[in-house]
Structure formats: structure tokens, C-alpha cells
Amino acid sequence: AMAICMSAIAPVLYTTKAKPFSYNKSNMNSEINKKIISIVKSTGITYIYGEDFWRMQLLNSIDAEVHSSELTDAYDKFVIPRTWLSRPSWYCINGEVLYYTKDGKADKIIESELKSKNGKILYNGAEGKIWLGPVIWSKPKWCN
């Protein structure tokens, strides 16, 4: 019964004026989204990570080559995979990946980690930054 009630909340909210998120406000052709597609195609690196479920998951819709997943902060010290509605295997990546940061708590941790590990800013604009760097989270047990 609880699951049914929880699954009904979002549709009910969208029929009222209390809309917690509006897809109409997301611009799939924004400058940063165009930059992400361009960087993915030029580097061949298709995995991109960052804070905020809505920011990251929507990127999966902009191009078939973009594989985006959310990272969240843990104890204000490091980031961990947020596997809710993400493909678990996307957190088992080796080598360099991309990061999309703005000004959130986890974004600040991501940027700090990338600076300490020689990450490179590939784009810095009003909508955020795109970084190239190593995997900065501890890989989950399911990756073994």
C-alpha cells in the first residue's frame, strides 16, 4: 500500500500547481549540453558524473553516446555513487571520465578531488564546468 501511495505522489503533484520539477524548464539545447556532446565526441569518453539527479539523468536523453550518473556527498568529505535509477555498471569504470559541476555540496567535493588529482577543466561557463579526470569514488563491491 505504501508503494502505491508513493508512486501516486508525482502524478498528483503534476496535476496541481505544486510542480517540483518541470521538464519544460530544461533546455536540452543549452550551451553546456552542446558542450557535453562536443566533448564526448572529441574525447571518446562517454561517461559523465555530477551532483543532482535531475541534472545528470536528463543528460542521458541528449545523445545516445552520453552515459551520465549521479554522485552524492558522504559525510561532507567524499562522494559516493547514487545508484537509484542509475546503471550500477556505470560506476565500475576505469580510466578517465568526465564530470559536470555547478555549485552544490557534492560538486565542491568533486572539484576539490579533481584539483588534487590533476583533473582538467575542459569547459567553464555560466551553467557549470566540465572536467576531465580520474574516477574519484571507491568502486562499489558489485564491480569485482
Task: State the predicted function of each range.
Residues 77-90:
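Alpha-helical scaffolding within the catalytic cores
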Residues 1-16:
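Signature aromatic-anchored transmembrane alpha helix within multi-pass, membrane-resident enzymes
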Residues 42-76:
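Short periplasmic/luminal acceptor-recognition loop of GT-C membrane glycosyltransferases, typified by
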Residues 18-23:
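Surface-exposed cleft-lining segments at the edges of enzyme active sites
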Residues 61, 91-94:
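Extracellular/periplasmic catalytic domains that process cell-envelope and extracellular macromolecules
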Residues 24-41:
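A short, well-structured juxtamembrane/interface segment
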Residues 44-51, 93-103:
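Short hydrophobic beta-strand segments
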Residues 83, 96-144:
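Aromatic/acidic, Gly/Pro-rich catalytic loop(s) in extracytoplasmic/lumenal soluble domains
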